[in-house]
From Swiss-Prot:
Family as reported in the entry's similarity comment: Belongs to the FliT family.
Gene name per UniProt: fliT
Assembly information from the UniProt record: Homodimer. Interacts with FliD and FlhC.
Swiss-Prot/TrEMBL keywords: Bacterial flagellum biogenesis, Chaperone, Cytoplasm, Repressor, Transcription, Transcription regulation
Entry's localization field: Cytoplasm, Cytosol
Disulphide bridges, residue numbers: none
Alphabetical GO biological process terms: bacterial-type flagellum organization; negative regulation of bacterial-type flagellum assembly; protein folding
Name this polypeptide is given: Flagellar protein FliT
Amino acid sequence: MNNAPHLYFAWQQLVEKSQLMLRLATEEQWDELIASEMAYVNAVQEIAHLTEEVAPSTTMQEQLRPMLRLILDNESKVKQLLQIRMDELAKLVGQSSVQKSVLSAYGDQGGFVLAPQDNLF
């Protein structure tokens, strides 16, 4: 069975999904990025299934190589953007933790505001 056209089309779809994920990450549309991940994983599984059935010819591999490079480049860029986002979230969680500690330490003052006063002697 010649599945070369179907395999090539599957790779094109994977490239499109990869480019979509990169665009979403670049635009910081994190919810949409996560939602698109399953379609990407399914596309990868489809390609794996197709290549298990019949190994692509050397010619087909040469045609697919630029697509694979693009997909890997996009994936690397998405990972970098995700790492930046994770660092931002870690910083926010750290700030929130500090605020919680401050509120815990100073929030139980019985409703009194503690402030320095001038000595009136």
